[in-house]
Amino acid sequence: MNTVRETIAAIATAQGRGGVGIVRLSGPLAGKAGQLITGRTLTPRHAHYGPFRDDDGLVLDEGIALFFPGPNSFTGEDVLELQGHGGPVVLDMLLQRCVQVGCRLARPGEFSERAFLNDKLDLAQAEAIADLIEASSSQAARNALRSLQGEFSKRVHSLTEALIALRIYVEAAIDFPEEEIDFLADGHVLSMLDAVRGELSTVQREAGQGALLRDGMTVVIAGRPNAGKSSLLNQLAGREAAIVTDIAGTTRDILREHIHIDGMPLHVVDTAGLRDTDDHVEKIGVERALKAIGEADRVLLVVDSTAPEASDPFALWPEFLDQRPDPAKVTLIRNKADLSGEHVGLEQCDDGHVTITLSAKGDDTGLQLLRDHLKACMGYEQTAESGFSARRRHLDALRQASEHLEHGRAQLTLAGAGELLAEDLRQAQHALGEITGAFSSDDLLGRIFSSFCIGK
């Protein structure tokens, strides 16, 4: 049997007790199930209050029944919602009644999956439903809602249309060689290609911010021993998460804390002090610290502002740049301002580098500057009209599309190879199609929708 034609049922409200609980059905039997359970023919899109009965006519509960005939429903199929009281026993009895009249229990995310398969929404919009439910901040919720409304998808479709137009031009020139179009001399191809690359770069940047808001930013605290890294972690965490002593090298391993700043998720990693050492255990800690630096979204390079090397803290940077090629993702923290007498504040250079001077021992002003800086790095300052949610798989697809465009441009400019450019354009279009589901394997769809709540 084609499972899409089966009628599915699930409890759509969260587990536990509440004033209202909802059982949702989708499929060809939804209308008949509503008639059998309520004892009446349901008028589409009208609220019907009355009893919900079992097969013997006994009342299971009282509530509201809503019937939405397809295709004008969330899933594109006939949909029935039974809104009763929110007790788990009552809802389970009602769900079993739905099974009794011919429904089967829905898989996690199957309602959203059917909406996708029936072209009611694309894959990015379907994922935004889960992101909206799981949002840990108002900004993340707004971004998810904009993705659900199609903002991210519109940007991807715009890129796809531009690629299609470019492919038509290139492939027409290849198929009709008598036109003798010189791609390089024409200049039109390069102009169109560079325009797509520029827009793709913008979407990549905005999607990266959206992914940080959704998944949280990994912040690694690094620096020399005894620079105050663990004290800074404790202040950010709001508790004594790390042992703090005056003995250099107290922290010898990775210490992770998951915190929220105004609802924004951050994964803060305290690391062993970076120095040459003969201590085998400490050496392992330093190696792990360098590995964590390479995987970080943001590195806080902490220096002791009273130490001699504080006058030239960037002497530490070669060690960091081996792991973190982008120095723009490193924030310099000049710690112990209470001892050095330096002014607490934030300084941003013309090249974008940020230095924050603070004291990790109770300096509220400096710590608030750091919190605000981290929020800005995550895109918290974006307005509700500019952001959208994104996932790591979206970033991978955008990266692949960008790489294909870069490769195709190189093939065109270095070898004048229009055929190779055409293939790279096709591959880039395919990568973008994976975001919206235009090109997606059944395995990918299964993994995505299985992570949803049952009833969604």
Swiss-Prot record:
Q: What GO cellular component term, any one, is given? A: cytosol
State the family named in the UniProt similarity comment for this chain.
Belongs to the TRAFAC class TrmE-Era-EngA-EngB-Septin-like GTPase superfamily. TrmE GTPase family.
Signal sequence coordinates: none
InterPro entries, per database record? G_TrmE, GTP-bd, GTP-bd_TrmE_N, GTPase_MnmE, MnmE_dom2, MnmE_helical, P-loop_NTPase, Small_GTP-bd
Q: What is this protein called?
A: tRNA modification GTPase MnmE
Pfam families tied to this protein: MMR_HSR1 (PF01926), MnmE_helical (PF12631), TrmE_N (PF10396)
- Cofactor(s), by name: K(+)
Amino acids binding K(+): 226, 245, 247, 250
Q: Which GO molecular function annotations are given, in alphabetical order?
A: GTP binding; GTPase activity; metal ion binding
Localization? Cytoplasm
Q: How is the cofactor bound?
A: Binds 1 potassium ion per subunit.
Q: Where does Mg(2+) bind?
A: 230, 251
